[in-house]
Amino acid sequence: KPELEWEVDAFWKKFREEVLSEIASGAKVSMELRVSEAPELRRELAIQVKSEIEAQGGQVEEVTVLSAYKQGLLWLMEQVAPVLENLPVATVELGWKPFPVEIPTDQRFQGEPARWLNELYPADDLLAGQLGLPLNSVSFFMQEEGESIYSVTAKDSSGAVLLQDSFSPKYYERPYFDAFPDYAQVTVTTGWLKATVDEVTLVDERIATDSDRIWDYYQATTLEEVYDEIKSNTGGKPTRDKAPYFHTLRVELKASEPDYKLEIDQEHISVLESLHDDIYFDTLDFFYEVAETAAGGDAPRSRSLAPGNVLPWIHPERRGQPPELTITYSGFASKQPKLVVRYREKENEEYETETRVLAPAEIPEPYIYLAEVKAGEDGLARLGFLVTLEDTEPLPRLATLLDNLQRLQDEGLFTEALGIRGAAQIVVRLEAPGAVSTRTYASQPAERSAAPSELYRSRLVTWDHVISPAESEIISHTLGTLPNVTTYVGGYSYQGRPVSVMEIKLPMEAELVSQAKLNTWKPVLSIVGRQHANEVSSTSHILRLAELMATDPQYQSYLKRMNVVIQPVVNPDGASLSYELQKLTPTHCLHAGRYSALGPDVPGQVNNPDTLLTEALVMRDVSRKWVADVRLNPHGYPSHEWVHQFANYNPKSFRSYWIPRGWYTSARVIEDPRLKDYNDAALAMRDYIAEEVSKDPQVRETNLRIYDRYQRWTMRWQPHLYNLEIYRDTAIYHSRRSSSVSVPGPEALIRPTVFSGSTEAMDETAQGPWLDLVTRMGFGYLMASVRFLDEAVYSLYRMEGESQGSVRISLTRPRPIRSGRPGSGNQQ
């Protein structure tokens, strides 16, 4: 917990020691200060500075206190716009200088050429609104000449110049990582003080902002100490296979930094949010580099690395006080599980301790060798599993383990272990060369549907608030009491939270149902939500669809043509964290909750049977159980500008997400005649999506406005990085941008899923009316897929055969299904 000086205190010390003390009676004083503080505090500072100058006998010529964050934008709005308000302005032209980019370069990344333009965002909307001008009256141009980074020219309706001015931000360069200085250099805007007395410059130097001081400490002290610790714990080689390196790196911050909303959609000014994102993403980058360095540069960079839980915990603005930084690093209690027993004998007063390391047992995959039925009894009387061992060495240990499980169950513990629905007893048979050991257990499966406090009575899912994982569980299991919904806990997350699955289909009387038949008789729609758990709207519209299909006859009718499987929250650990963080800063993006509790993306662990992220195994199990015809994975992204101050301003690994571009999705095709059914489906889905999403007038108007803003600020200047494809007033990416395309392999021709879709909604973090709006966008997308499946064309083939006195009957549904929309394969 370091003692960090407040930037304003640093200013006062320098000003009073080096400027105020030099002011003689009648001296003319000018001062410009740049600090990273809220506008109200900066105005108070200016008043106080003037007062102290006058008390010293000086004459104030000019005192200006500007923002050290987004310096160009706030110079325009606070210094230029008030002057223009009193003039007959017809047009405003804003010039900006390109940010220098070196090609070729040894740096891992650089700033964007339009970086200085980006720092003006959203100046055109703000200026037009403040001056009462049409939006197209404010224009930008790239300027190569002149010393200043920015220029502004205001003209009247005749073209006469009313105002011309220029401005440059103050900035410095630093390494992206102190520990790896060759990785990249970044340019960071900063604070400054310039003071003149009687035209003599007394001070013209940097005043480090609070965020500068915080970041310097975090890089030079925290990350260096953490790096030393994990090297010590890994024998000097913190390679990827030795991760996770730690349990939690928590960075709690209270600071006097600007954090306020702009009157443009969900845009805001927030140094605090930027610090959250730098702490989170830059730290993950740091550990990627740690692993790569340990591997001699051969480690692939991947989001699958699980360094540990990086947790920025940022409090709301604490105006007018020094920053309070508390950093907590915690490792794991033990490198591997241990059983420690401390005991003493009755006759002995001294305690003794025994420690045993618990190594995992290497158990081969069991096979079913026994399925016993009895006349007049439902289900299986016994279900037997055979474990075949190569030698006898592990047999006693496994037998003891099974005996201990029996003893625990006799005491009422772990009663659901080895519980399988539809079987009365479970038999476990261990076979080794020359030895056999068998145990029998009562099968006590967990209830598939949790008992809610009350049955479903009225609408549960509303779109006026963020749904927490706990609320999602209540909703899911309450809906599970209805006839056509089966809700069960598919597994548990790394931190022990339930991951529930909802299966929605027409009611069935039988307790045992063939999964093969469910996959065959009707198409399957599979939907997952909150993979990136701070993208909050997906759970809301997914659960609402589930509720309607469970309770509304109109929506229930769709179940005649499809089965639906839903995972409302596949990343409950991240969702729980982001839910708690939004209580502090409700509209921040809260990316610390994006990935899992250990850092990697959950789906990246689906095919890793040894993963620590057990929530990924639920996704794996559901995808194996339900062979989906359509898969949907709705996502989200920031609802406002996304800034990384210490990574050259724009989000380093997510450049195209810098500002909102409205709701969007993709329906891509590969020009290959062998993939006609898949391409036809994508073309049909494009129409269904446009119809369902943009039929809401407010959704359509909002998206078109933000699409236009995105084009003005990004595509015009850097089309290689930013693009949009608008189809029927909806952003749906369809065309290839690359000049080449990979040739699809054989697996592309046999995949059963005809359409896999993802979306991006402006929902990090949406609240209130904005959450309702973006959730309506997502619900329209779900309904597009429901309509597609409802109208799809598919066939069922019944085949019968007789052989050696037995009759075989099979039912087959060829895949992929085909679009039922006439002419879908001929759309342009």
Regions found by a protein language model. Give the residues of each.
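C-terminal accessory segments enriched in acidic
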Residues: K1-V461, V618-A628, H640-Q828
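Soluble metallo-hydrolase cores and metallopeptidase-like ectodomains found primarily
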Residues: S458-I527
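Short, conserved catalytic or adaptor-binding loops enriched in Gly and charged residues
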Residues: I475-T481, S557-Y558, A592-Y595, A748-R751
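Generic recognition of flexible, low-complexity loop/linker segments
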Residues: T487-G490, L512-Q515, Y555, V618-D621, ...
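Short glycine/proline-enriched loop/turn "hinge" motifs that connect secondary-structure elements
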Residues: V513-T520, H591-Y595, P746-T753
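Active-site/substrate-binding loop(s) of hydrolase catalytic cores
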Residues: N519-V524, V536-D680
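Short active-site segment of divalent metal-dependent hydrolases/proteases
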Residues: A533
